[in-house]
């Protein structure tokens, strides 16, 4: 009999705005909070953890192995290894897939997998080992260079969204309508307390004392088509992608605890879901936002599912243009996609988002008694990743 790999707990921090509540918290502090809470929710002692795997993209100046820093700070003994993975925006979901594989192969028994990112703390830098003999020099923004800049074509991720909009014929109005729907769904979900179960509050030390952050900071209330249609294009003056129909620049952390179903039963834990399949795929870097199309198809094929079998989908909204293209190409029921809004409203802490979308999916599946779900993200450099889970 097959011993499934299951997710026994899942949680995330609130998503912080750029230079907002978490402006001075390094990524490993956000990761620490998520890891510790995930273990507490699972009822698992840190000493039982075989390894910790954390997605993170912006590691410049963050110290050796931020995943290890988060792991030890969360109370996991030094005997349990920890390491980081960088598959850009897919990192947090790839970390979960790697944990799944480690348990499946018998290399680990219990894995904490997740993602952590502080875009606010990404430093500016310059290579000065040879010195600057004369003249000025420019500081490089590592957040853009390492996280948001296409290395193959030499332009911003926003330009890839413009490419997708043209190729898939997604108009400015369609993008703005999608963005408004995302914001409005998130506003309604927050008023209904939909995210409270999945969020673990973060305590931030300030000069005036401790401040507890327990709510997503980025969503905007009362967004209308009229209010965002006035914005100018951000990447091409003749383009359609704006700050309002793109995801945010954000900080956050998320984590899940993985083990075999037999181990969960032994511990008396009811899993949130079992991992049925996962897949990643490559596309032209110039249209990286379409990566979820082949990745989702591959994950569904591995699972033996059809798109019609899906009860819920969480698809990361890097840009409205790519989200619309993914929906259009896959032809799935959009009423089941991002039912509480997505990254355009909630934000996109790049290395953590893969786990964030999975966590949000798992809790909404629980609320709706949904059976089959899929989480997917596009990935800079021309890739996509997807995972199928079942309750």
List the predicted regions and their residue ranges.
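N-terminal extracellular/periplasmic Venus flytrap/periplasmic-binding protein-like
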Residues: 11-13, 24-28, 32, 41, ...
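Flexible glycine-/small-residue-enriched beta->alpha junction loops
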Residues: 110-164
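Condensing-enzyme catalytic core mediating Claisen C-C bond formation in acyl metabolism
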Residues: 1-25, 224-290, 294, 359-360, ...
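Conserved catalytic cysteine-centered active-site region
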Residues: 56-110, 140, 152-156, 222-248, ...
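Short, well-ordered amphipathic alpha-helical segments that serve as non-catalytic structural scaffolds
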Residues: 28-43, 66-70, 95-98, 157-164, ...
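Active-site-proximal alpha-helical scaffold in enzymes
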Residues: 87-117, 159, 165-194, 256-262, ...
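Active-site pocket-lining segment
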Residues: 160-162, 195-198, 205-206, 276-345
